[in-house]
Amino acid sequence: MKYKNILFLCLMLFLSASAYPALKDYIYPFSSPSFNEYGTVGLIRMPSARLHEEGTIAFNWAKNDPYTRGSIIAYPFSWLEASWQYTDVDNALYSNVESFSGKQTYKDKGFDVKFKLVSEGSLVPNIALGIRDIAGTGTFAAEYLVASKNIDISSSFNHFNYETTIDLTIG
């Protein structure tokens, strides 16, 4: 029984020591903001106040029934995000006249802009103002004022004076 306990303890120490560098390899390189369904920085359909680096150009493809969206996103300045998207709505016809539409589904295009008003500081969040679906049909039109702040969370495991710390960023 004592042999099994020592073996278990050695295995736990080995796994704890090897997990920390592996987590750093996977968590920190991918800490840039993600794109939402509309092709702008955010989560799912919610925009955030974060922006990618100046000079970034990105392409985004999102499928969330009944919407399929393709987007081109550009960051010409550190304070501006501009995107163009083309949307296919699977459950609606192109026209109210079924004989005119045939099997063609409804399509929509739109242009979005987001302006960063305040950059994140130690106590102040990122603040941005955005307008969605400019020069489109207005189906997905929205105006928003959004704030985003990074929060660091630390977790520790301490056993026999051996400590492993995992740092996560919630955004």
List where the protein language model places each region.
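Bacterial N-terminal signal peptides
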Residues: 8-16
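Active-site pocket-lining/capping segments in soluble small-molecule metabolic enzymes
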Residues: 163-171
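Histidine- and/or cysteine-centered catalytic micro-motif in compact active-site loops
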Residues: 3, 150, 171
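Cytosolic catalytic regions of ATP/NTP-dependent phosphoryl-transfer enzymes
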Residues: 147
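Bacterial N-terminal signal peptides that target proteins for export
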Residues: 1-7
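Transmembrane beta-barrel domains of Gram-negative outer membranes and organellar outer membranes
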Residues: 20-139, 150-164
